[in-house]
Every structure is written in structure tokens, then in C-alpha cells.
Amino acid sequence: VWLRAASMAEGYWRNGQLVSLVNDEGWYATRDRGEMHNGKLTIVGRLDNLFFSGGEGIQPEEVERVIAAHPAVLQVFIVPVADKEFGHRPVAVMEYDHESVDLSEWVKDKLARFQQPVRWLTLPPELKNGGIKISRQALKEWVQRQQ
């Protein structure tokens, strides 16, 4: 998604200089991935979160939306883990409204096989202590330690 408007910020201050937010034509790259359907823009997710598994692109936010539709799910995050065969594989880190639920069967007809998590982990309380937003980087590091 790229934006251009008359009311955009001039830039940000770095090392004593104003650094422009826009390219030479005045466009700002949001680093969001979007899709346009019938004149309506839908934000799909952050480009920084996109990863590949067996040559297939996985946008974590798309998978998270599907899993979050289950009534027992309070929060879900999809993070990549390194895999020798596929490059990366998706792992779900979840918070439930009660004891953990097996969602691997539930997602089979809702997600493509490459999008289906290979592991389902419960969100640890220590990752929720930093405020409202949970860091994807902290989640990735935590998942790596669980290997």
C-alpha cells in the first residue's frame, strides 16, 4: 500500500536532519500489503511479517483471522520457524478462553495445507506483561527456544 496526500508529514528527524517519508513522486510506502476489490481497499497484513514455506507465501495475519474465528480463541499469532525442507513452517501461539483446544482438525477445511500450523503453543504470560501489543519478534524468539 502506497499513500500520497497533501496533508502528510514532511518526514522524521534523524541525526540532526529531516529525512523524507516519501519517494521522489511524493508516495509513502506503508509496508502494508493490501488488496483492492470493487474500489474497497482491504489491508491484508504487514509485508515485514510475510514468510515463505515451500515456495508459498504465508501472510500471518490472514491465517490469524481464520483461527481467531474459533469461539475458544482469544488471541492468536502465527510465527515462522526454520525448516530444512520447506524453509519455514507456521507455528500458532495462542491464548484461549479456557483450557487449550485442538484446532488442527478445525482448520483443515479452512486453511490451505501450507498455511496450517505445524505446532500449537499456548501464549506464555511473560509475553503479555509488556503492555497491550505483543511483540512478534519476542514471540519468534520464544518459539525458537521451545524447539
Residue positions per predicted region:
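Acidic/polar alpha-helix N-cap and adjacent early helical turns
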Residues: 142-147
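Flexible glycine/proline-rich
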Residues: 14
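Short basic/glycine-enriched coil/helix segment immediately N-terminal to the Walker B
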Residues: 22-23
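AMP-binding/adenylate-forming catalytic core of the ANL superfamily
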Residues: 5, 10-11, 26, 31-115, ...
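Short secondary-structure edge/capping micro-motifs at helix/strand boundaries
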Residues: 18-19
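Short proline/glycine- and acidic-rich turn/helix-capping motifs at secondary-structure junctions
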Residues: 120-131
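A structural motif
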Residues: 1-3
